[in-house]
Curated annotation (Swiss-Prot):
Organism annotation: Heliocidaris tuberculata (Sea urchin)
The protein, known as: Actin, cytoskeletal
Gene Ontology CC terms: cytoplasm; cytoskeleton
Propeptide residue interval(s): 1-2
PROSITE patterns registered for this protein in UniProt: ACTINS_1 (PS00406), ACTINS_2 (PS00432), ACTINS_ACT_LIKE (PS01132)
Cellular localisation: Cytoplasm; Cytoplasm, Cytoskeleton
InterPro entries found in the cross-reference section: Actin, Actin/actin-like_CS, Actin_CS, ATPase_NBD
């Protein structure tokens, strides 16, 4: 079925960004926001070629007149019509391929509802007529990308964070933990604490500005209390940011108060454990014999793991929780923003993987539920 000439397509549909490209490449060809925008106003000029919806970068550039919606929330697709638009845009506009000619590897968050992956499968075969497809777990792909078969992956994106322990290539489902606290919640929290400074951001378009501030200026403090004291005592931590209209705003302790939420979810009123404790709890749910290997191979992945200082802080927090003699190593590859995609590219180009694809024929015989039998 899968000749060498036909490259598989790898599509990592994140809650915030969609990463797409060809298996065997070392980086995704297309990276664009998972956004569908619809005009807020009535079009008055004829012949402008206005559309009733815009996807990705085009929606982002016209955000001033659009209402922006993310069809994926917390890693789960909540609006399938918009999701189809994003896939259509991925295949036809970004990659410029005919999906009926290529196997497609999709990714999903662990512990997702079964109906979610069935619907993904159905759309790929029925709407896009793909010859074959597969759904892989995001965190497992990140581990592949780091060149390991054993380790615990802390994957934190825009919509969901999860810890997935993997031993010799097997994910341990009983020990997977999921935390619905990720990049989008941090953006919302930053919007809130910037309001305390007197800067008001409210619309869906303004949220994107705040997301940019977060990505450019935020960092993780090694010692939160001490950093707060430093910020209060001097202006050494202050940075300025120019808004699209030329206004310049200054932010200080917000720079590290925002990502601190990952370690103290109580900041946004969540009762759950922080990412360090979640990682520790996940390791503790595993067999006592393999914990040592997990502590020594803790891999960070996803865009929300990109804050400067986060690896050192994780090292410090997990060292405090773990037995004192335990060797702890936090691996934070520089390309971790795309490591899920890179892992997918590696997986889909392995010769041993070629028999794993769900073919159109198998789908026609068994229906969407085939995905649970063939994809872990």
């Amino acid at each position: 079925m899968c000749d060498d000439e036909v490259a598989a397509l790898v599509v990592d549909n994140g809650s915030g960004m969609c990463k797409a490209g060809f298996a065997g490449d070392d980086a995704p060809r297309a990276v664009f926001p998972s956004i569908v925008g619809r005009p807020r106003h009535q079009g008055v000029m004829v012949g402008m070629g206005q559309k009733d919806s815009y996807v990705g970068d085009e929606a982002q550039s016209k955000r001033g007149i659009l209402t922006l919606k993310y069809p994926i929330e917390h890693g789960i697709v909540t609006n399938w019509d918009d999701m189809e638009k994003i896939w259509h845009h991925t295949f036809y506009n970004e990659l410029r391929v005919a999906p009926e000619e290529h196997p497609v590897l999709l990714t999903e968050a662990p512990l997702n509802p079964k109906a979610n992956r069935e619907k993904m499968t159905q759309i790929m075969f029925e709407t896009f007529n793909a010859p074959a497809m597969y759904v892989a777990i995001q965190a497992v792909l990140s581990l592949y990308a780091s060149g390991r078969t054993t380790g615990i992956v802390l994957d934190s994106g825009d919509g969901v964070t999860h810890t997935v322990p993997i031993y010799e290539g097997y994910a341990l489902p009983h020990a997977i933990l999921r935390l619905d606290l990720a990049g989008r919640d941090l953006t919302d929290y930053l919007m809130k604490i910037l309001t305390e400074r007197g800067y008001s951001f409210t619309t869906t378009a303004e949220r994107e500005i705040v997301r940019d501030i977060k990505e450019k200026l935020c960092y993780t403090a090694l010692d939160f209390e001490q950093e707060m004291a430093t910020a209060a005592a001097s202006s050494s931590l202050e940075k300025s940011y120019e808004l699209p209209d030329g206004q310049v705003i200054t932010i200080g302790n917000e720079r590290f108060r925002c990502p601190e939420t990952l370690f103290q979810p109580a900041f946004i009123g969540m009762e759950s454990a922080g990412i360090h404790e979640t990682t520790y709890n996940s390791i503790m749910k595993c067999d006592i014999d393999i914990r040592k290997d997990l502590y020594a191979n803790t891999v960070l992945s996803g865009g929300t793991s990109m804050y400067p200082g986060i690896a050192d802080r994780m090292q410090k927090e997990i060292t405090a929780l773990a037995p004192s003699s335990m060797k702890i190593k936090i691996i934070a590859p520089p390309e971790r923003k795309y490591s899920v995609w890179i892992g997918g590219s590696i997986l889909a180009s392995l010769s041993t993987f070629q028999q794993m694809w769900i073919s159109k024929q198998e789908y026609d015989e068994s229906g969407p539920s085939i995905v649970h039998r063939k994809c872990f």
